[in-house]
Design a protein with these regions (language model features):
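A common structural junction motif
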Residues: 119-121
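Divalent-metal coordination cores built from histidine and acidic residues
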Residues: 114-117
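N- or domain-start disorder-to-order transition segments that initiate the globular core
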Residues: 1-32
Length: 121
């Protein structure tokens, strides 16, 4: 089969880390001083067996219950202190073939956002 891919915009930088994580970076001048980080995990409801129903969605929710660098409600507390509110800003969703975590954050706090996504990955 001859598969054709949609070409990537020339303004998008992308690559793959040694651990297999593929990343995409796109500069956007608006809104000024803001960034949106997303982690898309290839795990969704269609990949679950009958006895695993709901596991991807459950895992999505558990990410907000703590991580290596942010135990307990540390993720929510840390981001809230930076002006990112859980639910209104900080969010996630589980689809058929993916789970996506979304962190809109001030550009000056990118390292914190990346550290959280690294824990979740």
């Amino acid at each position: 089969m001859n598969v054709k891919y949609v070409p990537t915009d020339a303004g998008v930088r992308y690559g793959q880390l040694e651990n297999g994580v593929t990343y995409y970076v796109c500069r956007n001048p608006m809104p000024k001083g803001k960034a949106e980080l997303r982690l898309a995990v290839r795990a969704g409801s269609v990949m679950e067996d009958e006895h695993e129903r709901g596991l991807a969605h459950f895992t999505e929710h558990m990410a907000f219950k703590g991580s290596s660098h942010f135990p307990g409600t540390g993720v929510i507390r840390e981001l809230s202190a930076l002006g990112v509110e859980f639910g209104a800003d900080l969010n996630a969703y589980t689809g058929f073939d993916r789970t996506v975590y979304i962190i809109p954050i001030a550009s000056s706090h990118l390292l914190t956002g990346v550290r959280i996504l690294a824990d979740w990955a």
